């Protein structure tokens, strides 16, 4: 989620591939091949070659995802230093008791420090966060995020953006949120290789 280059390297080796996250995975792979200078057809060929290698079927338009990746202006994030301070930890502990709420809040805070705009607004995919944090997506969207909102950690903005598979089943959902805690990338603790669990064990 934070280090997208590391994430892509894992996917290319067939690791941590969650079929519920295929839309995001395909998008990141398309960006990866775009940055290698490939054209539309070459990107498509590489993605389907990867899919055949790991027996993965794409239940959506890969070409549409390729267009999205080609239009995206942001390069894949590499090893970005994300710092957590004692003040950050205090903000979380002042609001939450449950382990999963604290981990989700920490993960969203880390993600927002590198992905939020100048107003502290960031788009969050509950499917992608569920895969990263090894939590049930329904628990994140139905229980944990409402608690984060109720206790003034963040606020919900606008409508949800939903992507569907060919059979109309939900593929992924994104919604924008505004963090209501300070977003200052400073502190003693560091997130490395997207390992939120090691970071959580250090700060909580």
Language model features with spans:
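Modules that initiate DNA replication and primer synthesis
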Residues: 1-102, 109-168, 173, 182-187
């Amino acid at each position: 989620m934070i280090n997208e280059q590391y994430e892509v390297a894992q996917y290319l080796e067939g690791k941590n591939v969650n079929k519920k996250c295929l839309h995001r995975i395909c998008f990141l792979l398309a960006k990866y091949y775009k940055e290698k200078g490939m054209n539309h057809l070459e990107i498509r060929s590489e993605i389907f070659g990867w899919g055949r290698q790991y027996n993965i079927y794409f239940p959506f338009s890969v070409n549409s995802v390729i267009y999205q990746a080609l239009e995206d202006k942001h390069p894949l994030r590499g090893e970005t230093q994300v710092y957590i301070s004692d003040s950050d930890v205090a903000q979380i502990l002042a609001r939450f008791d449950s382990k999963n709420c604290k981990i989700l809040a920490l993960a969203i805070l880390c993600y927002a420090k590198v992905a939020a705009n100048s107003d502290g607004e960031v788009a969050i995919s509950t499917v992608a966060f569920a895969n990263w944090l090894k939590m049930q997506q329904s628990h994140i969207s139905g229980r944990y995020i409402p608690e984060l909102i109720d206790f003034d950690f963040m606020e919900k903005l606008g409508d949800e953006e939903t992507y569907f598979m060919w059979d109309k089943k939900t593929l992924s959902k994104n919604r924008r949120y505004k963090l209501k805690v300070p977003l200052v990338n400073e502190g003693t603790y560091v997130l490395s290789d997207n390992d939120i669990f090691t970071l959580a064990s250090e700060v909580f």
